[in-house]
């Protein structure tokens, strides 16, 4: 099929914070759509999930995109993953299994039973590695990740490339001393584990999609957002996409390039050849004091594309220094809408402990990368169990699968002795529990299913929830002292806001907020 070479644009759009890059990109898309371009002939890719979610929502609202049409808006990793059907993503359960097997001889891996994991671990969520959660193994695999984003010439010789990168770039600063032989061992076993189980991680998605046998689709319009955050490896994917696309629009702000620590290389964006460069002239978000601070800082950036813009808002804004959170405690309350951020997560811990002590719900993003979003301090599973208990108190019925989750979190002696396991295990439970059409009231549970709990009591007197953030010998600085401490926090939060939804406080590193 002969390609239609009607489109030949190569454009770079620069815009500071609040200058309307997304709005400008959507105007570009609208022009093409108005001229007859079909939605599936335009691909929009971004660095982070937040970027993609925003683009999808706006295309649904402004262009009446269907759920099928929004499938042409995705992260770079998701685009690559969609071309790798024969692989499974490395999940949290897979990560735990690897860490367990790493302590044994690979020859004996086949003899090790796969352990049972929580329901959340079993879900297809991307697993990420970090030193806080995974210790030295996480730090080593972060080195591997950085190497793969930076060493592209011959990664088929992965171990050699990795060790060359390690020898050239590794300097101290880690909590643990990492030796050469440890890096070699963990990398070798990690690759063996992934191959044995047909698994891929974030870097594999990109690397394997670059293989010549993987054919990318043809697009008349390719739009790439947040270009300043892309690594060399991600730019390789963009290069492959652009070779098979007619028009290319690159949007970003090199002044906001703060992901160099994870392999991003803003110089590629700065030097990428285009026919036209467009600078968005005004920020509609920043008040004057914040704008002035940002402008003062840009003078310290050695190389930039000259993305100069003016402030549009009349408001001055507030810029203050505080010594402790108590100075703004009148603003930190139910209904607050704010971001608490710091350069590193250990600085954010202070925010989290403060919010925990006063009983406010918050969302956080710690060292997780592209695969994770902000997670609430009160999990969805906890909220659902509390809501279901409230339903039972009103005389309403709930599904059998919800009954099983509810009974699992009961305190001791609230089920007839010896019956609890049979009620919460899918292989042993009453078959009617698995019937999605049936509902069970509390009177039914009490009469037929050995439940001894008092329906008149508050959920706090019935359940004892678990948390992975309770102090142990391996986690001496975890957030909660014990399960009682965690459940007391849940009680305080519920008493302030039974919906757990009124407060919108984000706690994150600066990088996490931006991503």
What are the residue ranges of the model-derived segments?
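Accessory N-terminal region flanking or inserted into the helicase ATPase core
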Residues: 1-15, 23-24, 41, 120-223, ...
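P-loop NTPase Walker
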Residues: 1-91, 292-295, 508, 513-514
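Conserved helicase motor core of SF1/SF2 NTP-dependent helicases
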Residues: 16-21, 27, 47-50, 221, ...
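Core RecA-like ATPase module of SF1/SF2 helicases and allied nucleic-acid translocases
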Residues: 19, 49, 78, 288-291, ...
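Glycine-rich, phosphate-binding/catalytic loops in enzymes
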Residues: 31, 60-64, 89-90, 239-243, ...
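Conserved P-loop NTPase-based nucleic-acid remodeling module centered on helicase motor cores
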Residues: 41, 46-144, 358, 363-370
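Conserved two-lobed SF2 helicase motor
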Residues: 72-75, 201-209, 503-511
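Conserved interdomain hinge at the start of the Helicase C-terminal
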Residues: 320-336
């Amino acid at each position: 099929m002969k390609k239609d070479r009607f489109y030949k644009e190569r454009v770079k759009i620069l815009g500071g914070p609040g200058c309307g890059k997304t709005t400008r990109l959507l105007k570009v898309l609208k022009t093409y759509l108005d001229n007859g371009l079909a939605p599936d002939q335009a691909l929009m890719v971004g660095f982070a999930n937040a970027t993609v979610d925003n683009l999808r929502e706006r295309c649904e609202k402004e262009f009446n995109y269907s759920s099928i049409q929004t499938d042409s808006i995705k992260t770079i990793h998701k685009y690559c993953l969609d071309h790798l059907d024969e692989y499974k993503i490395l999940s949290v359960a897979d990560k735990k299994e690897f860490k367990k097997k790493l302590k044994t001889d690979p020859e004996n891996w086949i003899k090790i039973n796969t352990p049972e994991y929580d329901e959340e671990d079993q879900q297809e969520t991307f697993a990420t590695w970090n030193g806080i959660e995974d210790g030295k193994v996480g730090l080593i695999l972060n080195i591997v990740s950085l190497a793969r984003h930076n060493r592209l010439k011959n990664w088929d010789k992965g171990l050699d490339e990795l060790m060359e990168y390690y020898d050239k770039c590794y300097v101290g600063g880690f909590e643990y001393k990492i030796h050469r032989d440890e890096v070699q061992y963990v990398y070798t076993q990690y690759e063996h584990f992934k191959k044995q189980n047909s698994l891929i991680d974030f870097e594999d998605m990109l690397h394997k999609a670059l293989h010549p046998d993987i054919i990318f689709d043809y697009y008349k319009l390719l739009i790439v957002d947040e270009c300043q955050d892309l690594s060399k490896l991600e730019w390789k994917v963009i290069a492959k996409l652009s070779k098979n696309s007619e028009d290319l629009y690159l949007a970003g702000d090199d002044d906001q390039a703060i992901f160099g620590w994870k392999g991003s290389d803003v110089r590629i964006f700065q030097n990428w050849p285009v026919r036209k460069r467009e600078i968005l002239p005004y920020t509609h978000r920043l008040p004057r004091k914040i704008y002035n601070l940002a402008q003062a800082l840009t003078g310290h950036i050695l190389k930039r594309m000259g993305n100069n813009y003016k402030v549009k808002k009349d408001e001055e804004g507030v810029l203050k220094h505080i010594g402790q959170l108590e100075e703004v405690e009148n603003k930190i309350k139910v209904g607050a809408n704010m971001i608490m951020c710091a350069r590193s997560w250990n600085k954010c811990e202070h925010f989290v402990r403060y919010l925990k002590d006063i009983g406010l719900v918050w969302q956080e993003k710690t060292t997780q990368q592209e695969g994770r979003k902000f997670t609430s301090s009160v999990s969805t599973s906890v909220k659902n169990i509390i809501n279901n208990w409230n339903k039972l108190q009103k005389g309403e019925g709930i599904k059998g699968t919800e009954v099983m989750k509810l009974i699992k979190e009961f305190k001791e002696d609230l089920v007839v002795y010896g019956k609890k396991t049979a009620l919460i295990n899918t292989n042993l439970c009453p078959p009617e529990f698995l019937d999605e059409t049936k509902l069970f009231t509390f009177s039914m549970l009490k009469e037929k299913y050995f439940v001894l709990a008092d329906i008149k009591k508050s959920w706090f007197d019935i359940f004892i929830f678990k948390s992975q953030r309770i102090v142990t010998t391996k986690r001496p600085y975890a957030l909660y002292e014990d399960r009682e401490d965690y459940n007391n926090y849940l009680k305080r939060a519920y008493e302030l806001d039974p919906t757990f939804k009124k407060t919108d406080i984000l706690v994150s590193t600066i990088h996490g907020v931006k991503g």
